[in-house]
UniProtKB/Swiss-Prot annotation:
Identification of the protein by name: Chaperone protein DnaK
InterPro entries reported for this sequence: ATPase_NBD, Chaperone_DnaK, Heat_shock_70_CS, HSP70_C_sf, HSP70_peptide-bd_sf, Hsp_70_fam
Induction remark: By stress conditions e.g. heat shock.
Entry's Gene Ontology molecular function annotations: ATP binding; ATP-dependent protein folding chaperone; unfolded protein binding
Pfam families to which the protein is assigned, alphabetical: HSP70
Amino acid sequence: MGKIIGIDLGTTNSCVAVMDGDKPRVIENAEGARTTPSIIAYTDKETLVGQPAKRQAITNPKNTLFAIKRLIGRRFTDAEVQRDIEIMPFEISKADNGDAWVTVKGDKLAPPQISAEILKKMKKTAEDFLGEPVTEAVITVPAYFNDAQRQATKDAGRIAGLDVKRIINEPTAAALAYGLDSKKENQTIAVYDLGGGTFDISIIEIDNFDGEQTFEVRATNGDTHLGGEDFDNRVINYLVEEFKKQGVDLRNDPMAMQRVKEAAEKAKIELSSAQETEVNLPYITADATGPKHLNIKVTRAKLESLVEDLVNRSLEPLKTALADAGLSVGDINDVILVGGQTRMPLVQKKVADFFGKTRKDVNPDEAVMAIGAAVQGGVLSGSVTDVLLLDVTPLSLGIETMGGVMTTLIEKNTTIPTKKSQVFSTAEDNQSAVTIHVLQGERKRAADNKSLGQFNLEGINPAPRGMPQIEVTFDIDANGIINVSAKDKNTGKEQQIKIQASSGLSDAEVEQMVRDAEANAEADKKFEELVQVCNQADGIAHATRKQITEAGDALNADDKAKIEAAISELETAAKGEDKAEIEAKIEALIKASEPLMLAAQAKAQGGEQPQQSQKDDGVVDAEFEEVKDNK
């Protein structure tokens, strides 16, 4: 069985880890970093992911996508999406199914399709390290992700060529990583996870017995649209409004806004360790009076005043999670802070004040989620046997009943996997069919909750209202993904639905995206092969010219003209994109260069160099032979 990798698919950064023996190991990417920016850029020739995409963001703002996790599994009409439309430099558009998608160069792309590019990068990073294909993964998601968002994350994995064996909640993954370093007495921990785009709080009990650890999530809560991006946006707005006093609104200039975004993020980070910083962006824009420069001083106090309400927003879920777990602040042994935004002193102070104790950092480089996911991968593959994980469903599940009320079947914070049934009946006499409308949320009114889908159970025998017995069963798997069935106990007729969420991608759409991804992989491979053969052509042309110079008069004029013509034809071919033609021109140059080799040998034999040196000087021979080997 191959390795199951652990992937932290983050809003701002992503990371991959794997069990290396009995220890999880974070794998460095091709750029040598443990984390990869969750940024994707589409250029005319290729798709860039990670640091290469980030480097060109200023000059390509409309086609450089970031924070896509904030859109995954969301409807275009969601209030959070509408807010993002106002601030994102790229175009967020409405898909035919009502989802929030992104339009790039005239093409509509689904968030799972875009996220798959990051997952493919993580997959290749792991494959390069392991030296073998990787097909299975555990992927982290915010604990407060609903069913649509979880399903969309699984779709992203599938598009990337991964069988997602488990979706694991981020705070739970952090607890697993924490537990590895803390095999001591039983304890209850609070995991406060404020990342780039989402916030979660989980209350987790860790029981240690006879060398085995049980991680039981008691309660979870959060906000799937609260994170570092929101903090950045407050700083961006402040800088733009301050600069507006010069009479120029930078919001009309996408390239300028991208520079401001980078500077705002940098300033926010610097203010975690400094009391003040200066944002200096020369030549940010220009008007009729000439170039304009942005130079604004930002203090830590100013930053805190801009974002204090966001930090306070994170405290309400803490109270709810503790209440749901039936615990008080005094019952918490340790507070674990994870996510890049928790480096902010104001966040640390507010959390410390709330719990009455200082926090503990698990891993400052944010690789902690991937480590936990890798441990779960080890559990699933059988390489880790002393860990048991008991997670929960973050939101209540139920159906719409008479009067537009949501009747809950499975309460939030129920340990998963779980299954529950309840008997309902008809609302009218002789009703022959019922519609089962599946909901997720905490509101009493059905319309105020998230609709996950609906289906009909037909063929009910005529009977007075209230007489037929319709058994509705909810079945939640370990990924938190839901199956719902309805059965007429009188006739035995049954109908069921695997909730894909009414805002999700259909199987056909996912399959098409898988095929597109495979096609792109083939195109990427061809592009890489073309670059390699062009480099070979350039090297051979350069080496051959050098040999012509060294041969001097030993090479006759006709042979020299033929070789130079072959070089010219090769260089012309190398400017195109026909790999076969370039290879043919390489072969033609090799053939045309045979007299050059003879001339070089004759000249060498006429000199004072020993035979061994003649062999060593056969540079062209070695290069020609190498090209043949590569074909």
